[in-house]
């Protein structure tokens, strides 16, 4: 990719091969592994076998400039659908068709017309809102883990999930997403937030 003529404009490296750049002002220096600007959320069930005609609904969350590249993600999913996914049976993987894409429950892309409708599929996430919520006072949080979760703490994996360890992980993720895909690391009082999480 480094010698490619399209390296400066191609979205592949910015989505899949994010360079580990050092930038004092953005907060990137402390980040060992840059986060990808997308999250694919699987369906909220335990279904592992899909028959012909079954629907597979999933969510795609894009961050930062990746939001401008929705058309490329749609195209990529269409290509994956024609190639197929899952275990090969008789030398073939299961093909699928991307039927539609929705944002805020509105159809913004349909296989029928093959066009992306003008839309505002973006929402602004604020790290400050998260911090202010913690400052408002003590409250109960019930957390249900749907998929396996492993968090590293003090250079080791810990089976116990204390709220302050979870808060550290959330703050680290927010910080790295803002540093790489937002407007730089948010001005949060990390130490105070973790202290509050221990209370």
Where in this protein do the model-derived segments appear?
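RNA-interacting cores
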Residues: 1-199
């Amino acid at each position: 990719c480094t010698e490619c003529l399209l390296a400066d404009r191609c979205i592949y490296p910015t989505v899949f091969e994010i360079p580990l750049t050092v930038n004092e002002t953005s907060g990137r220096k402390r980040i060992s592994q840059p986060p990808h600007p997308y999250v694919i959320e699987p369906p909220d069930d335990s279904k592992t076998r899909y028959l012909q005609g079954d629907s597979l609904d999933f969510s795609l969350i894009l961050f930062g400039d990746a939001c401008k590249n929705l058309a490329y993600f749609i195209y990529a999913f269409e290509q994956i659908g024609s190639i197929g996914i899952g275990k090969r049976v008789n030398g073939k993987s299961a093909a699928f068709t991307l039927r539609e894409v929705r944002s805020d429950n509105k159809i913004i892309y349909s296989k029928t017309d093959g066009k992306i409708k003008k839309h505002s599929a973006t929402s602004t996430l604020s790290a400050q809102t998260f911090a202010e919520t913690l400052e408002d006072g003590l409250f109960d949080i019930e957390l249900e883990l749907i998929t396996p979760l492993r968090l590293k703490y003090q250079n080791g994996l810990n089976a116990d999930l204390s709220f302050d360890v979870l808060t550290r992980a959330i703050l680290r993720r927010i910080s790295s997403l803002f540093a790489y895909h937002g407007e730089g690391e948010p001005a949060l009082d990390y130490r105070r937030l973790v202290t509050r999480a221990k209370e």
